[in-house]
Amino acid sequence: KHNPASEILSGLVGSEMCIRDRKEGGNAIDAAIAANAALGLMEPTGNGIGGDLFAIVWIEKEKKLYGLNASGRSPEDLTLKYFIENNFKSIPAYGPLPVSVPGCVDGWFELHNKFGKIKMRDILSPTIKYAEDGFPVTELVSYYMKNASDNFQDYPNFKETFFIDDSTPLKGQVFKNPDLANTLRTIVKSGKKGFYEGEIAHRIANFVQDQGGFLSYDDLKNHRSEWIEPVSTNYRGFDVWELPPNGQGIAALQILNLLEGYDIRSMGFGSADYIHHFVEAKKIAFADRAKYYADMDFNEIPVEYLISKEYADIRRKDINSENSAPTVSPGNIENGDTIYLTTADSEGNMVSLIQSNYRGMGSGMVPEGLGFMLQDRGELFSLDENHFNVYAPKKRPFHTIIPAFITKDGNPFISFGLMGGAMQPQGHAQIVINIIDFDMNLQEAGDAPRIRHQSNQQPTGGEMTDGGELALEKGFDYKQIRELMKKGHSVIYDLGSFGGYQAIMIDYINKVYFGASESRKDGSAIGY
């Protein structure tokens, strides 16, 4: 019998609510929904019911992984022609135009209907209580809310929902959101129809359209999540799992496939040799990401070929071990966005879940009286009509948020994730390498200094012409940095944007869970 249960997520209060659900007879799936609901209230800077959700679920009795894509689609009445005729070069970051259907609530019910044990009323009641009675705002959330407020103060209902008196909440202030409490009560009473049909859906659609947007009641009513098969590659005997596009998870698998051809262990963690090869592999994976990753309902994307060893062997020939590549083209495939949480229970079930509004709080669109902000994922469409990720009605945008999972010999090993936009697949690959190649434990793998490469080559357009920038977190040796510069890398120091990692590992023989949550963000590992 599995003795422990474990939850790792942002914020101690949210973690405690997970454990409460588990003690009252819930399982890892119930706990994940409870945690996500709590974080939507307590960390509106990263997620909420106005956003999307992705999950990978391990069901022990079936020895099977399930994948859930709960991302929403673009408005049916908004066309590419509208953007072109109005001279848009890209879709705006804020306002009504980047708003797509929020998929989170439907994702909750898909997870709950398939795997949940206790009633949704019991899952959401703690969050409803905290929304009514209030909770102390943490230092980090206070900081991010203040930063975000500059973008949103002129939008209707933002101050009424997220301000205390004349400003965003300060550290330690008790914040209440009674409107969100009422929205969650409606969801408890009427299920997902209470959100996607009826008064709430009408309020959302009417508000967005009043602000000049196109999201309609029918867009909300017709929304459906999709159960999908996770995809994997084997890295030195471990199967690493991600979800296929419209997300970016397979970039991590491409990076790992490319690096498997090198003796990473002998290079050593933090060496110029390792960092150089990692960055060059990342450039190749992200060149494909920029061109091919998009909604698979609109494109024939040979995912299995992109993550194959055969393709990696071809692309690895483009890596120069001595020099940084200034430009990288996507491969020829004709032959072939946040909070993260993870939960586990005494039955051996595990959930890897990530959820986000994109750009922190989202679009700035706060429908009156509902207590949440709508996401702005639509910003991540391209307006190039020849691009895989070109905008189209009823299409899912490219997504940055990705959950991950590792199995070994058909058994669960690690449920993990890492927040942070384009950092996510880079971070996933680094966590895997830290554990498998560099023999780090679960906590060390997250605490180790990270590498982040960035360039203009994105799924919305742009090209890398100068090799991009290599950002290194504090902790790397200066001699190694000089060697990287000699290889042609443009190296910068950066204190932020290296993601936020959390994980649960299971010792499958002894039936013991290990948890890890890093210091780059609020978060905790808790169990009973």
Model segments located where?
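Internal maturation/activation junctions in enzymes
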Residues: 261-356, 369-370, 377, 495
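Extended C-terminal subregions enriched in glycine
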Residues: 395, 428, 437-496
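Glycine-rich phosphate/pyrophosphate-binding beta-alpha loops
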Residues: 241-249, 342, 354-365, 418-425
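M16/insulysin-pitrilysin zinc metalloprotease superfamily fold
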Residues: 249-265, 406-414, 422-446
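Single conserved hydrophobic/aromatic residue that forms the stacking wall/gate
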Residues: 1-14, 19
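Short, small/polar residue-rich loop motifs at catalytic or cofactor-binding pockets
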Residues: 227, 335-338, 399-401
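Active-site rim segments in enzyme catalytic domains, especially the processed small/beta chain
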Residues: 41-67, 214-216, 349-414, 438, ...
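Noncatalytic scaffold domains of N-terminal-nucleophile
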Residues: 15, 23-24, 28-190, 195-197, ...
